[in-house]
Amino acid sequence: MATQPATESVQCFGRKKTAVAVTHCKRGSGLIKLNGCPIELFQPEILRFKIFEPVLLLGKHRFAGVNMRIRVNGGGHTSQVYAIRQSIAKALVAYYQKYVDEQSKKEIKDILVRYDRTLLVADPRRCEPKKFGGRGARSRYQKSYR
């Protein structure tokens, strides 16, 4: 049997609260698909530009040589969007490091970090659990002295 050459691909994830997005990035023609649909069709439309931030920052020429397939689940709309943009940015950096060259990877990383650090680094904040004696994590029920 003839062995197939290994495809140049990387897999990266992005997280925000409980939303997780996994991006498969491989050599291609610049297609970006989100849950099987083109990323241009993502709803809600207002949040679509947040997803396009890595593309707009780095220019389409850097994405022209790669295809990205993104799967996202968990969380709400906004959390999913932040997880998606993080996974896109991390996948492109990893692809350039592994298959292109270290210099262009460093340029990409510097541009992204200068704009918004959360494009590459996850936000560690999580929801605090509710405690007894109140409605939420910190608020307490009203106290009466008389």
Swiss-Prot record:
Keyword check for Cell division: no
A Pfam family this chain is assigned to: Ribosomal_S9
Please give a single GO biological process term from the UniProt record: translation
Tell me the compartments it is located in. Answer: Cytoplasm
**Superkingdom per UniProt:** Eukaryota
Key words of the record: Cytoplasm, Ribonucleoprotein, Ribosomal protein
Give one GO term, molecular function aspect. mRNA binding
Q: Which GO terms describe its cellular component?
A: chloroplast; cytosolic small ribosomal subunit; plasmodesma; plastid
Q: Which InterPro entries match?
A: Ribosomal_Su5_D2-typ_SF (IPR020568), Ribosomal_uS9 (IPR000754), Ribosomal_uS9_CS (IPR020574), Ribsml_uS5_D2-typ_fold_subgr (IPR014721)
Stated family: Belongs to the universal ribosomal protein uS9 family.
Name used for this protein in its record: Small ribosomal subunit protein uS9x
Q: Which organism is it from?
A: Arabidopsis thaliana (Mouse-ear cress)
